[in-house]
């Protein structure tokens, strides 16, 4: 009751009162540890917290479950709704992690989450993400073993050793500083007209293979997947659209400090660097405002914009695009793709003498961002400092780690072959291929049983499955363009920078040769040592590199149910991408085409809208919620994957669905900083990892049956609200 002796049941419950009641109901809340400590909210305290709350309110606030408002205050006297109470209750379930019926993900993963850490050099940790670190270490060992002994000149091993040695030659890189790019920086600095700056841009493209403010390249032709199309791009935003529109002042200051640091490292005074950093920021913000939202870049209807060179030239009337096109080395083409016309128009407004200072600042900054890491350590340190300030993540690496990472990225085709020979089993390849074929049959059965799709559209969908190409482990043939790269050791006069430029030249030569030749659809989009998987709509294929086919996602000694909840979920997810809101716009040949009846597509769009609503606003960490619109394509894939792996498990005699569902939870266990969670919530087209477990499982009747989940439990949702597409 109240001090006056009354109970006052009709009074409005305030935020502070609700928090005190919460503490009393649970007998005191634990202090957050591990992942909860990293993602806790309100740990700085609230200046308007009422004194009367005493230790009870203090305990709740120190548990990290109170996010407060945008102004940084608690607003203790604000009224609390039933929805507010449910949100607080869900946060407590997550913090406690003691009941599968209330928060499955947190309960299954509690021991791991509470004891988790983030190793230096890793932005996110978890069984899935940690596998990337394991593979990186495996590849680094291959590289260091090769670099430790003499190699036969001209062999892949000799090039690996030479590149590694130049990265490790820190003393030489420090002594050289920005000398390798000084002539280009000077040329930018002395350009007095927009025409002169474009001449520098053309020179950069020809001599270094760099496009800094605009350029042409090749990409997939959405209308004919058997050919490439020329693509035009102009400078864009280095950060996310949300950053420029909604970023905090602290975040913006961190980015400006990073830009300023890069520019001072290139030889500018602090004052000049600060001024140019502001020019870069303003231009990027303008382009970002005119750009598509992140999820729109997956929509072929929005990004397939074909222009003639003369059409683009009208946007850039003060410069010669013909000169820039010639510098690209591409053969003439009357079809040029522009993925984001709004961003292009915003950038074009700077291509005149009035925008010269901004373009010069952009060009200089772009060079430094592109090749600064090949020069002295200051550029690497600046990046590490920014990452820590902006994302709350320590990406510090030893010189050996940096060298191995650079060699892995630049000589990936050589190392992919070596990785497969050392770390991949044919048994894993065979098991994955068998699982894929089984899933394809399950999908056919499920599609045939759909009650919202006509037979005509079903046959088209099944055709997409029948023609889907499967890539597992490694490619049938290996790329050879690196054989043409002139990679020299320090003793031969080679430097990290010169070797990078030589590799880029070889890659460009390969790209130019592809312009007027049929697309080789046996090419891989990923390296064998990549811990990821993908579906390509323009090839209608699924790719599962060797590195992902190992523990903890796949284990030859694990139960069938556990492998289904690990690698099975990922395989089924990629297959479903052929039928998400983006993949559904491509046919069996990888061409953008409408294979739907009008009525069926309308029904599909309604299904997708339901999926967006199912996820939208779902809170994962205090004050951090999911965007249904941003994540719709990945969520459709997740939901389809869950249906598929449950169907596969139910074909077993006496399937252990508890093992299956726990494996799903284990797969998506992850930890990172709160800043990174906030960043991913507005940029990542995947739902937060916790929702890839909980929100997906909440759509499965088998999940409720397995754990006896009933109304009133935290994981319960009414059957009529649960969504399903495939």
What do these predicted regions represent?
Residues 1-55, 66-82, 89-95, 454:
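Feature responds to low-complexity, polar/acidic, surface-exposed segments characteristic
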Residues 143-438:
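Noncatalytic, helix-rich "gating/capping" subdomain that lines the substrate-entry/channel surface
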Residues 112-116, 239, 552:
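Short, solvent-exposed loop/turn elements at domain surfaces
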Residues 3, 15-22, 42, 52-56, ...:
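Stable alpha-helical elements in mature extracytoplasmic
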Residues 99-103, 107-168:
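Active-site-surrounding "flap" and adjacent substrate/cofactor-binding loops of secreted or lumenal enzymes
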Residues 2, 23-31, 61-65, 90-94, ...:
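Sec-exported extracytoplasmic/periplasmic mature domains
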Residues 337, 341, 397, 408-412, ...:
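Intrinsically disordered, low-complexity linker/terminal regions across diverse proteins
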